[in-house]
Amino acid sequence: ALNPAFINIQSVAGSSAFEGEINEAKESFEKSDRVEYYRITTWKRAILRKIFDNSYDQIRHDKSLTTWIERNEWAKPYCVYCTLKQQNNEASWKDWSDYRDPDAEQVGKLWTKFRKDCLYHAWMQYVAEMQFCTAVSEVSQMGLHIKGDIPILINEDSADVWADRKYFSLADRAGAPPDMFSYAGQNWGFPTYRWDVIEKDNFSWWRKRLAQASKFYHAYRIDHVLGFFRIWTIPEKEVTGILGHFEPSVPLTWDVLHGAGFCRQSLEYLRNPNYSVDQLRGFLGDDTERLVAKCFENLPGTTDRFILRDEYSSEKQILAMEEPQAVKDAMLRVYWNRVFIPTGSDDVFYPYWYWYNQPVLYTLPQNEQDKLHDIIHANEHAQNALWEQNAMKLLSVLANETDMLVCAEDLGAVPPCVPTVLNKLNILSLRIERWARNWNMQYSPYYDMEEYPRLSVCTTSCHDTSTLRGLWKEPDFDRNLYWAHAHQMG
């Protein structure tokens, strides 16, 4: 769906009846030093509703609109969703009292029940699409091409997730693992895909998404292309990204760990540690006795070992405690202290990101610590082939579905399989000049542009950076190094 905020109101049939109101609003908006997005979008939707209501008899009998709705099967679920969302004061569908999990038949009945309001949303989409297609046609005649963006993920509170629930895992969230900029990683809040279900439907949801985009774009960028290789997956109950794992990935198994001498009890201890009061004092300090009584219970069969109560078994629950932030931080350190993250299976184990420096690891004999180091490091090297296979399957669909030129956002640290797959599928890579440097050498020299992949989009900046002029003015920017690089390139 398109954003009605970009509709040219004065070009909409029937707008002349409200010419004075439109001109007055336009003059008011143009006086502002900034684009008042919320105010403008609210006004546009309101004036579009006035135009729609005033022209309703003509609109509901418009054969072109009727045909457009029939050809775009996403339109009815989307319009029903928008109508219900308005009726529920824009609340998430998860908070609605009715219609939270509809099937196709129910969507059809709701379209009929709320036909006028649904038709209003369909009409806005039709108008927006016609205007966009006209603009693309005019630009094409000038010899220019339009490049769009295809985000890999979808907001949970969306028509797609509401209507096509089977394609999404609401028990998980996508994000990014910890790095030098974020100790706890990132939790983006978007549900992950159930790729097995999507594949059973011959990737129809993705094919339709690309077909819609191809109406407007000559080329498109795959945002976070690494997510088609593997996505950092976090349980929905968590807040940060620290307790995630890559999906898909080759897990450690009970057979491997048992073969190395680890028993069930030891592995459970490494996944869900238990503590003595003295050990907890190392985390909780002067609050130990109070917090043990409040947040912990005895390990079954013991009187002197403690585990977290179920009420404090997630980041959300810990951060919701009515305690000072310092206490919450200490409780999080207890919660994060593990070698393996919970998986819901006794036979599958994913290492915690910081497994190698956790206090629980150091309670093991040195020989067992060494075994775990060897096993986990070997497992890390086993992932590349799986990720290459997964990306080839998924990206082949995207690359071959339309005639749009495909570009990838492959910035940052990428697995070795990424350039291999992009080259095989003729998907363009991305190079941002200021970041295309050899960071392992003294002064981090810029790469010669002749070293960039032949199939790549090269630019001095992007939406995540300042402009080139802005970069030049940054106080810590090495102008001499960049100037030498620029002159070397001619």
Identify the function of each model-found stretch.
Residues A1-G490:
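Catalytic cores of glycan-processing enzymes that make or break glycosidic bonds
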